[in-house]
A protein has these predicted regions:
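Conserved C-terminal region and hinge/linker of Rieske [2Fe-2S] proteins, especially
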Residues: 1-232
Length: 232
């Protein structure tokens, strides 16, 4: 009986009534599939709570930055510190949460709705907000923004946040190819390789490279490793 009810709750729109009923179900009393449904239902409730959290963050921080430096990554010292204290976050993390909440609540209503309905996760909503911010700063056409948002939400259903990031970036690149090329050139200037000694005769090499160059390096290392393995 509980398994059937859990499955019904999974399909219902998230909200306080559904959450209360889930709390009153002991997941250990469910069979294997029922436990999975229970977990998924709780995850959907998490999306609903996160949607409320975006509204609450903006209520504390305000809908606009203290200093108008754009739609993203502005610094709001008093509000940021209040949110950092309330949520036990580092100040830089609190500022990021403020930025994301403003973008979601003011520019991405469909994303907020999808989050509240448990259709996407908080991580996916954050990705959509962050990747949309550059276009918002440049004054994206509302129709383009709606297309970007709808595509990202639909893609999120069966993909991870990292995959959603790549998808949204590809859409952004097509919408503003000139700016994308500028950003690619700027990113290439940050390439670097570091060598760090480690204990017990070991060392660590870290590299930030253009993808094509990184692929070449990886293939060379892999080839050398395979050769040494075959010799042994």
């Amino acid at each position: 009986m509980n398994e059937e009810r859990t499955k019904e709750l999974l399909e219902q729109t998230p909200g306080i009534d559904v959450l209360v009923e889930l709390i009153n179900i002991d997941p250990n009393s469910l069979n294997a599939s029922g436990r999975v449904d229970y977990l998924a239902a709780l995850e959907r409730q998490g999306g609903w709570l996160q949607a409320l959290m975006q509204i609450a963050i903006v209520a504390v921080a305000g809908s606009e930055p203290a200093a108008d430096r754009g739609n993203y990554s502005d610094v709001d010292d008093p509000q940021r510190e209040e949110i950092a204290s309330a949520l036990n976050l580092a100040p830089v993390t609190a500022q990021s949460r403020i930025d994301v909440a403003r973008v979601l609540t003011q520019h991405l209503p469909a994303t907020c709705t999808a989050l509240a309905n448990g259709e996407i996760s908080s991580a996916q909503a954050t990705v959509i907000a962050k990747e949309s911010s550059a276009l918002l700063r440049r004054g994206i056409d509302p129709d383009q923004l709606r297309y970007l948002e709808a595509t990202a939400i639909a893609y999120s259903e069966f993909h991870t946040p990292a995959q959603v990031t790549h998808k949204v970036r590809s859409i952004v690149a097509k919408m503003d190819p000139v700016e994308f090329e500028v950003e690619v050139a700027q990113a290439a200037q940050t390439r670097r390789v570091t060598f760090t000694p480690q204990p017990y005769g070991m060392a660590q090499i870290m590299a930030l490279l253009p993808a094509s160059e990184a692929q070449s390096v990886w293939l060379a290392i892999d080839k050398l490793a395979r050769s040494n393995r075959d010799k042994n």
